[in-house]
C-alpha cells in the first residue's frame, strides 16, 4: 500500500463544530485546498476530493485511492474498531452506475459471469465482465432495489464500463447512467455495523453483504457528510483506506487492478467461487471459464504472504516475486509472480497478496520485492480440472 499524500484538514470545537461529523464550511474549504493542488492541473483524472477529508486527522490516500482518507491518525486503532465494533470507510472515489428498465436483470445476466435473473430486491452480488478470451475486465459489486440495479466499481473504471454496457443495449428496455459525480460509496464494517446502519433514511441503496462482510451504502454525494456524521454519532469510528486494505488483504479478498493484471482469469484469484455462476447460460468469455474449470488448471494462483516483520518497508505493487532459494547474486533470477497488495495489519503484522505461477511449491519461501515472505495457499494448485475446492480464506466477521 502506497504512502499517503500527507494532506489533511481538521476542524475544532473552537470553531463551534462537532467532532462527530464534518461541518459543511470546513469540508468545502478542505475540498478547495485539495482541488488547488497538483491534481487540479488537468494532468490525469484524479477523483474529486471527499468532503470527509475534513474529519479530524484525515490524511489523503495516494494511488489508487486518491480523494479519500488513508487514515485519521491511528490506522491500527481504526482496524481494531472495524473488526471488534463498527467503523465507516469513505470509499467515495469508487465509480457508481445506476441501471434501470424492465430488462435490466436479464440483460446483466447475459453479459456478466453471475446469475442475476430473479435477483431479489436488496440481495447483493458480485459479477465480472470478461474479455472474449476470458480475461477479467471489470469487477462489479451490485444490488437491485426493486426499480434499479446499483453497481459500484474500482475508481476510474465507471466510464469505460458504462460505455461497454451502452454498446450492448440494442433494443432492450434498459438505461445506463454513470452517476459517480452524484453518488458515493460509504462502507460500514464490524459486528455492530448492521445495527448502526439500520434506519438510515438518506441512503439511496444498500449493497450487503459486500465482498468480505461489509455493508456498502450508496449515498447522494451532497448527503455524505450528513450520513457519515449520523453513523459517527451512533458510535462508529472513522477508518481510512489503510485500515480497509489491511482487513481486505487479511480476508484474502483480491482487488481488481492491484491483485490482477490484464491476463487474469477468474480462477486465478478465487472469483470462480464468489463472482462466477458455473451453470448459467452463455456470456462473453465463458468458453475459457468452462474449459479451465472442467479440463485444466489456471496458470497462476493467488497466495497470502506473511512478510518479514524486520524489514523497514513493504513491497510495492508490481514488485517481482521470486523463490527465496535462488542465488541472490544472480541478476537474472526469474520472477515467479508479482506482488499485488501489501499492508500492515494490527495483529498479523506486514501482510500481502501475490499472484504466482501454479507450479511454485506451496511450501516455498518467497521474496516479494526483496522482502522475505512465507506463503499461505488461497487458490490451490489443483483448482480447476473438475476439482471442487474450497478457498483458504480468513473469516472477517
Residues covered by each model-derived region:
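Short amphipathic beta-strand starts and helix->beta connectors
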Residues: 75-84, 125-139, 169-172, 197-205, ...
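Acidic, proline/glycine-enriched N-terminal capping motif
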Residues: 1-126, 130, 135-137
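Short, intrinsically disordered, mixed-charge
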Residues: 109-117, 163-171, 229, 233, ...
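Glycine-centered loop/turn motifs
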Residues: 121-124, 203, 252, 257, ...
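Acidic, low-complexity central loop/insert segments
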Residues: 96, 138-254
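Short glycine-/aliphatic-rich beta-strand segments at the starts of folded cytosolic domains
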Residues: 88-110, 175-191, 297-308
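Glycine-rich, small/acidic residue-mixed loop/short-helix segments
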Residues: 2-3, 8-12, 19-23, 272-276, ...
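Anionic-ligand-binding alpha/beta catalytic cores of soluble enzymes and soluble regulatory domains
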Residues: 218-306
Amino acid at each position: 500500500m502506497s504512502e499517503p499524500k500527507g494532506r489533511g484538514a481538521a476542524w475544532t470545537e473552537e470553531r463551534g463544530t462537532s467532532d462527530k461529523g464534518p461541518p459543511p464550511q470546513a469540508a468545502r474549504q478542505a475540498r478547495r485546498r485539495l482541488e488547488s493542488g497538483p491534481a487540479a492541473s488537468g494532468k490525469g483524472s484524479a477523483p474529486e476530493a471527499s468532503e470527509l477529508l475534513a474529519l479530524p486527522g484525515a490524511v489523503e490516500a495516494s494511488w489508487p485511492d486518491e480523494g479519500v482518507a488513508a487514515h485519521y491518525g491511528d490506522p491500527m486503532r481504526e482496524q481494531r474498531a472495524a473488526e471488534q465494533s463498527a467503523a465507516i470507510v469513505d470509499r467515495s472515489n469508487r465509480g457508481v452506475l445506476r441501471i434501470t428498465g424492465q430488462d435490466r436483470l436479464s440483460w446483466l445476466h447475459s453479459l456478466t459471469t453471475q446469475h442475476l435473473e430473479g435477483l431479489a430486491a436488496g440481495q447483493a452480488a458480485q459479477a465480472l465482465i470478461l474479455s472474449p478470451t476470458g480475461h477479467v475486465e471489470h469487477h462489479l459489486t451490485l444490488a437491485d432495489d426493486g426499480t434499479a440495479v446499483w453497481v459500484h466499481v474500482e475508481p476510474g473504471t465507471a466510464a469505460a464500463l458504462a460505455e461497454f454496457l451502452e454498446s450492448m443495449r440494442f433494443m432492450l428496455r434498459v438505461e445506463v447512467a454513470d452517476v459517480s459525480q452524484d453518488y458515493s460509496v460509504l462502507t460500514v464494517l464490524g459486528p455492530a455495523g448492521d445495527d448502526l446502519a439500520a434506519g438510515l433514511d438518506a441512503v439511496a441503496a444498500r449493497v450487503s453483504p459486500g465482498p468480505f462482510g461489509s455493508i456498502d451504502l450508496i449515498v447522494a454525494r451532497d448527503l455524505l457528510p450528513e450520513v457519515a456524521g449520523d453513523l459517527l454519532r451512533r458510535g462508529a469510528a472513522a477508518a481510512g483506506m489503510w485500515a480497509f486494505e489491511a482487513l481486505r488483504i487479511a480476508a484474502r479478498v483480491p482487488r481488481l487492478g492491484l491483485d490482477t493484471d490484464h491476463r487474469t482469469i477468474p480462477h486465478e484469484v478465487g472469483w470462480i467461487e464468489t463472482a462466477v455462476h458455473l451453470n448459467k447460460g452463455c456470456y462473453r468469455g465463458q468458453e475459457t471459464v468452462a474449459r479451465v474449470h472442467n479440463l485444466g488448471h489456471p496458470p497462476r494462483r493467488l497466495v497470502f504472504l506473511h512478510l518479514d516483520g524486520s524489514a523497514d518497508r513493504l513491497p510495492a505493487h508490481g514488485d517481482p516475486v521470486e523463490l527465496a532459494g535462488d542465488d541472490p547474486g544472480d541478476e537474472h533470477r526469474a520472477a515467479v509472480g508479482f506482488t499485488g497488495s501489501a499492508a500492515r495489519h494490527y495483529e498479523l503484522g506486514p501482510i500481502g497478496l501475490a499472484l504466482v505461477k501454479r507450479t511454485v511449491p506451496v511450501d516455498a519461501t518467497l521474496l516479494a520485492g526483496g522482502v522475505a515472505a512465507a506463503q499461505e495457499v488461497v487458490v490451490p494448485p489443483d483448482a480447476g480440472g473438475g476439482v471442487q475446492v474450497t478457498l483458504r480464506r480468513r473469516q472477517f466477521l
